[in-house]
């Protein structure tokens, strides 16, 4: 399992091969089935050993069995250590994860307790010297996950003045760290059940509870049923966004509709049900909702919620608006109409008050620094056409219909002369005597994972060993995304799929804010790490909440330079937007830049083949990569 891979990687990092292990008297046993252990093999391996070290994550399941099996054996080891050492001091934690760096240190320290091997002693000194600086740096931007541009939760999670809400499982949980009077959460399916108990001991006599349509279908209806039985005053806001957005955009099980949900809730005994939507006109006069259900436009959400909180018992608001990310996908695939309309901000009129951000809670409204101070602009590349930003009382907004964004005409890659790049020097080849470690960093939803997949496929095309590990989670919502890529001559050379501390050979920084985060800085080494950084100052979520938020770009650049052997800054977003009319090409552009510099161990031809195999926006990606 994973522990075995980390131990193998640790031994490789310590330069302990089979010959050297034999010299040290070091042996390795891989457990195939952790419970119950096969006793005869354990006895055979452990007998006459001086010390057994058990590496496992979480609780000591294997360690305890080994101790029990060997306890009465005549040839038992002198010591068996794992979670604790022979002095009963902590050795390995039962929380967190095992990493090759930690395992290397444990192995080196255990060996040198009894064997003063000079090679291992030197390695141990290097491990301790290379301990990265991971302290949180104050005064710079932080890439916190946030609602996507045009996300329905921007509107649906608002609560009227004087009320509070409780968070739930789903993207809407992020309301808990926004200015939304939203707090507390439970496990999936218990949303609101905590109010049954606490309502008897607080001054508030009512609360709102957010719950996604996927959670509702999965198990949330049980919590609603319990609230009805307990006769507590609570309004459930069922956030119907037509997709299980946090896990891939698939439809909820059973494919529920607002009308079906209203009937189910009415059958549970809930008499006050309201539907709120960004397009209520779609229902028509014959839509089959439960008796007494009211339908309102989202602009009336405040009045609707104020009414719902006055009713005794359980009330429900079904907020119906399609997930913004899913809308973008469907429009791209021709499955949903793309409104022939865009909103812009006239910076000559804008006074930079930030009311548009406050009204819409949208990350596509970005700062525009001018001679007259900070103003606002709409990022047309990320805008999902929700248009809630125009709801504020602002004369600077201009709505344009029947027009498209002017794009510079770029010659398709297929039409470029084949010899146009011949004068460029060939990228230098990288020695793969040991795995080459790349970390791609960027913002969720911008194609960071795709870059990792393409480099992985290019390596595969060249018959190299490669591993790709993506760390995403809720990061797809505008937060930090990391892709760990390890390329080697052979798959046998790769054990752990995660880049170790101070081991990154290349940081491909598609967003420089993410590069300065602790999880990335601990991978960097001032003696070996090359950094290719997109230094465009993409605004962070903090700007939505604070119109005077400082990005700290100069400090960020200094931190990256201080952590790298060599740093190359390039404004990939500015260049790609000018060339292609869309910033989405920036990640592919900076990848091509890094490869031309000789910092990616694959050939350009292999990357181009991988782009073609991916079969998504092939011409644009090829052009961005080549330029």
Please provide the spans of the model-predicted regions.
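Glycine-rich ThDP/TPP pyrophosphate-binding loop and its adjacent helix/strand module
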Residues: 1-4, 9-44, 243-335
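Terminal amphipathic helices with adjacent charged low-complexity linkers/tails
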Residues: 20-123, 333-341, 370-415, 605-627
């Amino acid at each position: 399992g994973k522990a075995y891979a980390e131990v193998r990687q640790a031994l490789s990092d310590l330069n302990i091969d089979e010959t050297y292990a034999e010299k040290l008297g070091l042996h390795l046993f891989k457990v195939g089935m952790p419970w119950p252990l096969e006793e005869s093999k354990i006895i055979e391996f452990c007998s006459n050993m001086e010390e057994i070290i058990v590496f496992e994550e979480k609780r000591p399941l294997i360690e305890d069995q080994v101790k029990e099996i060997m306890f009465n054996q005549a040839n038992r080891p002198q010591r068996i250590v794992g979670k604790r050492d022979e002095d009963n001091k902590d050795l390995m934690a039962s929380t967190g994860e095992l990493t090759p760096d930690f395992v290397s240190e444990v192995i080196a320290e255990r060996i040198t307790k009894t064997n003063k091997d000079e090679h291992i002693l030197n390695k141990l000194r290097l491990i301790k010297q290379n301990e990265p600086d991971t302290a949180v740096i104050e005064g710079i931007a932080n890439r916190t996950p946030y609602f996507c541009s045009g996300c329905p939760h921007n509107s649906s999670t608002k609560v009227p003045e004087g009320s509070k809400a409780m968070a739930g499982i789903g993207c809407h949980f992020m309301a808990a760290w926004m200015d939304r009077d939203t707090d507390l959460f439970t496990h999936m399916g218990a949303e609101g059940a905590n109010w049954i108990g606490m309502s008897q001991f607080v001054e508030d006599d009512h609360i709102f509870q957010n719950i996604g349509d996927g959670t509702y279908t999965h198990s949330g209806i049980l919590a609603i049923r319990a609230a009805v039985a307990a006769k507590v005053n609570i309004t459930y806001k069922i956030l119907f966004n037509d997709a299980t957005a946090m896990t891939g955009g698939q439809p909820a099980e059973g494919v529920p509709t607002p009308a079906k949900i209203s009937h189910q809730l009415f059958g549970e005994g809930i008499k006050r049900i309201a539907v709120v939507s960004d397009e209520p006109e779609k229902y028509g006069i014959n839509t089959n909702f439960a008796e007494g259900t009211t339908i309102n436009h989202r602009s009336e959400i405040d009045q609707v919620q104020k009414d719902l909180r006055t009713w005794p018992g359980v009330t429900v608001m079904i907020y119906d608006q399609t997930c913004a990310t899913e809308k973008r996908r469907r429009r791209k695939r021709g499955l949903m109409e793309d409104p022939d309309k865009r909103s812009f901000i006239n910076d000559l009129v804008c006074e930079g008050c930030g009311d548009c951000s406050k009204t819409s809670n949208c990350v596509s409204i970005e700062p525009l620094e001018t001679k007259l101070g900070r103003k606002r602009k709409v990022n047309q590349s990320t805008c999902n056409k929700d248009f809630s930003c125009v709801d504020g009382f602002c004369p600077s907004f201009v709505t344009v219909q029947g027009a498209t964004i002017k794009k510079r005409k770029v010659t398709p890659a297929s039409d470029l002369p084949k010899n146009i790049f011949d004068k460029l020097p060939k990228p230098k080849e990288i020695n793969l005597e040991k795995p080459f470690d790349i970390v791609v960093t960027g913002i969720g939803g911008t194609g960071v994972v795709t870059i990792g997949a393409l480099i992985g496929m290019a390596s595969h095309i060249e018959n190299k060993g490669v591993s790709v590990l993506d760390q995403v989670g809720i990061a797809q919502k505008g937060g930090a995304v990391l892709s760990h890529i390890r390329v080697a001559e052979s798959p046998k050379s790769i054990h752990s799929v995660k880049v170790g501390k101070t081991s990154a050979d290349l940081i491909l920084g598609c967003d420089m804010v993410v590069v300065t985060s602790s999880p990335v800085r601990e991978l960097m080494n001032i003696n070996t790490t090359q950094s290719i950084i997109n230094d465009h100052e993409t605004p962070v979520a903090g700007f939505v909440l604070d119109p005077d938020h400082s990005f700290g770009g100069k400090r960020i650049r200094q931190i990256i330079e201080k952590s790298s052997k060599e740093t190359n800054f390039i404004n990939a977003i500015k260049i790609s937007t000018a060339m292609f009319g869309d910033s989405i090409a920036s990640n592919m552009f900076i990848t091509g830049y890094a490869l031309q510099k000789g910092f990616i161990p694959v050939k350009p031809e292999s990357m181009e083949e991988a782009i073609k195999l991916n079969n998504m926006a092939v011409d644009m990606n090829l052009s961005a990569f080549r330029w």
